Amino acid sequence: MSILSLPVAADTLARVFAGAVNPAPKAAVRFAEIPGRTSQATIPTRYGPVAATLYHPPSDVGCPPVYVNVHGGGFVVGHPEQDDPWCRYLAANAGVVVVNPDYVLAPRHRFPAAPQQIYDIVCWAAEEERDWDGTRLCVGGQSAGGNLSAAAARLALENCTPVIALQVLHYAPLDLATPTRDKPSTIVARAVLKPWMGEVFDTAYIPDRAQRLDRLASPAWGANADEIVGIAPAVVVTAEHDRLRDEAHRYAEKLHAAGSLIEYHEVTGVDHGYNIMSGALDVTRAVYSRIAGHVARATGSP
C-alpha cells in the first residue's frame, strides 16, 4: 500500500497542492478579445452559501438560457476563475448566462458533499425567479467539474427535477474506483496527470475505497449506469493522451445505450487540461465552438 493512500498523507499533500497551484490559463488561450459582462451572486446550499460569478450574453435580448459551469481541480483545488475564458466564450457564443460557482472542497468536505452542493446550485439555477429561463438549463465542467456535473445530472434524474437540457463532460474522471496507476496514457511518463496525483486527489476526496464505487463518484464503473434511461442528454469530450480518456469513453457508451449521448468527441494530439495548461489556441477554439453549438441547440438559443 502506498503512503499516499493514507488520508493523513493525502490530506497534507492536497492542501499543499491547493495552495501552490496557479491554474490561470496560458495567455494564448485566454480569449482576451471577448469582453465579459459579469455580476456576482450568492447561492444558498445545504452546505452554506457559495459565491458565484455570472457571465451574461453580450446583449440583453429576451430571457436567456442558463449554463452551470463546474470548475476542475481534482476535488481539492478551488479556482473557478480558471474557467473565465471558457465562461466568457460560452456566454458570447451560445447566448446563455453562465453561472460559475465555488463549491466545497476536500479534504475539509469529503464525498458526497461536492456533488450534493452542485446539485443544489443546479436546482437554484432552475428556479423561476431568476433573471434567465431556468427551463432551458445545462450543466457542465472539465476534469473534476465534469465528474460533479455527471453526478448532478444523475441526482436530477433520480429526483425528477430539475430538467436538464444538456450535460457537458469535458475530460472528466468518471471511474474513481480504478486507481490512476492502472489508467494508461499514450505518452506514459509525459502525461499531465501522474499516478501519484490521482492517488492524492482520490484519497483526499474519498478515503474509503468502497465508497468510490458509488454511482455519483464512478458513473462509468461496473453496473452504475445500468439505470440511467432518461438522464440528461450528454456531450462527452476527451483528450487523446489523457489517462481519463478510456473511462469517459466507457461512460459515453453507456449514455449511448440509454439514448442520452449527443456526441462523443476525442480531441487528438492533446492531454488533460490542454485548454488551460497549453497554448493550443486553435484546438481549444475549435472545441469551445463545438460545445457552444451543442449548448445553443439544446437550449434553443439563437
PLM feature segments, named:
Residues C63-G74:
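Short beta-strand element of the alpha/beta-hydrolase
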Residues M1-P58, Q211-R212, G300-P302:
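A glycine/proline-hinged amphipathic helix-loop "lid/cap" segment
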Residues G141, G145, S149:
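Gly/Ala-rich beta-loop-alpha elbow adjacent to hydrolase catalytic centers
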Residues G74, Y103-P107, L174, D271:
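Alpha/beta-hydrolase active-site loop signature
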Residues V66, G95-V99:
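A fold-wide structural signal in alpha/beta-hydrolase
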Residues H79-P80, W86, V99-R136, S278-T284:
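Catalytic nucleophile-loop/oxyanion-hole region of alpha/beta-hydrolase
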Residues T135, A150-P302:
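Alpha/beta hydrolase fold serine-hydrolase catalytic domain that processes acyl esters and thioesters
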